Amino acid sequence: MTEADRIARAYEGLEERAGGRWDPANRGNQAIVRERRVATTRLLQEAGMLPLGTREVLEVGSGAGGELGWLLELGAEPERLTGVDLLEDRVATAAKAYPGIRFRQGNAEKLEFANGSFDLVMSITVFSSIFDARMAANVAAEILRVLRAGGGLLWYDVRYDSLSNRNVRAVTAARVRELFPPLRGELTTVTLLPPLARRLGPLTAGSYPLLARVAPLRSHLIGLLRKPLH
């Protein structure tokens, strides 16, 4: 079994097995998404990339398409957005939900795009699912290849191992630098530990921001890493 096969098998039917862990109606999950999107907007604004307009954007591991769909709120043109995912059913779900956006099934080790095709590449909780070092290096190399000089990689992934999901492993800041040595930019901690956030219930609005101020309780890294012009 290849690493890509292992990942696909691990994520087939994951939502059903997770027992509502990622329920979008959960207030903690809503707070997690809201915080990430606020941080993403700030990073793109500071980089001078908003409104997205005609910028070409690729999401590796696009899942059900929600993050690319959200970029429409940041001024992206749907025909400029592309998502790639291993699972055909996720690609089908995304294409149905966002018919104006291009979604493709494929392995990110071999992206079918020309060099420098994208101004922005998004990797949201992707590399934490790749255990094989060679595959991780291959995917990183492909991201670097299709990213234009001056473009950015939007990174968001876990910095701690998951106690509830054995198919996820931590990706430290040092590991990100190893995977993408040419890229420049800062990674900061974000996201209250999801198991804690999901248990806050009606206290979420007040408690989430307070608890998220405690650095060890922030489980993810986020950053916009730029590819030098030269």
Regions found by a protein language model. Name each.
Residues 1-52:
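Conserved class I S-adenosyl-L-methionine
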Residues 122:
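A conserved beta-strand element that flanks and buttresses the S-adenosyl-L-methionine
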Residues 167-188:
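Short alpha-helix
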Residues 150-157:
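Conserved beta-strand signature within the Rossmann-like core of class I S-adenosyl-L-methionine
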Residues 125-129:
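Short catalytic micro-motifs in class I SAM-dependent methyltransferases
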Residues 137-149:
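A short glycine-rich, Lys/Arg-flanked "PGG" loop and its adjoining helix->strand segment in the class I
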Residues 174, 188-230:
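A C-terminal cap/extension of S-adenosyl-L-methionine-dependent methyltransferases
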Residues 58, 65-110:
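Class I SAM-dependent methyltransferase SAM/SAH-binding core
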